[in-house]
């Protein structure tokens, strides 16, 4: 579901040090 996908993006973005979500 969309919320799970958004959480995954947030985790990946945080780990890479780049915030993609909402850019």
Curated annotation (Swiss-Prot):
It is found in: Secreted. Binds 1 Ca(2+) ion. One of its GO terms (molecular function) is phospholipase A2 activity. Contains 7 disulfide bonds. Expressed by the venom gland. GO terms for cellular component: extracellular region. It comes from the Eukaryota. Its EC number is 3.1.1.4. Its main location: secreted. GO terms for biological process: lipid catabolic process. Its cofactor is Ca(2+). It catalyses: a 1,2-diacyl-sn-glycero-3-phosphocholine + H2O = a 1-acyl-sn-glycero-3-phosphocholine + a fatty acid + H(+). Keywords: Calcium, Disulfide bond, Hydrolase, Lipid degradation, Lipid metabolism, Metal-binding, Secreted, Toxin. Snake venom phospholipase A2 (PLA2) that shows a moderate inhibition of ADP-induced human platelet aggregation when tested on platelet rich plasma. Exhibits high hydrolytic activities and prefers the anionic micelles (dPPC with deoxycholate) to the zwitterionic micelles (dPPC with Triton X-100). PLA2 catalyzes the calcium-dependent hydrolysis of the 2-acyl groups in 3-sn-phosphoglycerides. Belongs to the phospholipase A2 family. Group II subfamily. This is Acidic phospholipase A2 Ts-A5.
């Amino acid at each position: 579901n969309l919320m799970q996908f958004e959480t995954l993006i947030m985790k990946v973005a945080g780990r890479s040090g780049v915030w993609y979500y909402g850019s």
